[in-house]
Amino acid sequence: YAMTSDREAEPVALQFLAKGFAVFVLRYSVQPSRYPVALLEAAEAMRLIRANADQWHVNPAQVAVLGFSAGGHLAANLATSVGDEDIREQGGIDPDAVRPNALMLSYPVITAGKYAHRGSFQCLLGDQAHNQALLDKFSIEKHIDAKTPPVFVWHTMTDDAVPVENTLMLIQACRAAGVSIEAHLFPEGSHGLSLANAETAGNGFYAHIVECVQCWPDLAEAWLRRLF
């Protein structure tokens, strides 16, 4: 919620385009905008895609959303029931009509609890970032339910920005709620890897080139094709 990353946008979209998927990139509002601005933008993007499904050659019942880091929190917010009331009341949109059919997450921010990435919630909530009721509301693991679509998630065990416990808590919550989830935990790699290759490393930052992680788009493709 501090920024949107070029490294996690077009290069990833082109990977999935090459695999035969229609792709869209949302540049949502970040700080100083606060909740629910980004969520309403995501909901409107989903509404627009489904409204133009025939023209854009999209199956409206096979729309997945993919988010990285704090963008993963936004994607999960849209996919779960966390923001339903805000989407309905402030966006004038039926939340069930814009819920994705699949949720894909890369090193996502999930919890606002012990293992939170505090900066994300500071950007999301501003001076309300210490409001415990809001922190509970935006802890995604507390809101996984029957409306949550199937989930694909990956994380690295050595992520020093968004702890892997975020994904572990998501796995536990999905299991408890009976939500299908495929999870991949890689042994090494810093936060923000994107495709984990030279294309997305940026400025010679070789720590973002991690060979064992580079398979995740193929794993995600296989998951999507099994699902749809």
Feature map (PLM): residue ranges:
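Conserved serine/cysteine hydrolase catalytic core
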Residues: 140-148
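C-terminal catalytic histidine-bearing segment of alpha/beta-hydrolase fold enzymes
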Residues: 168-228
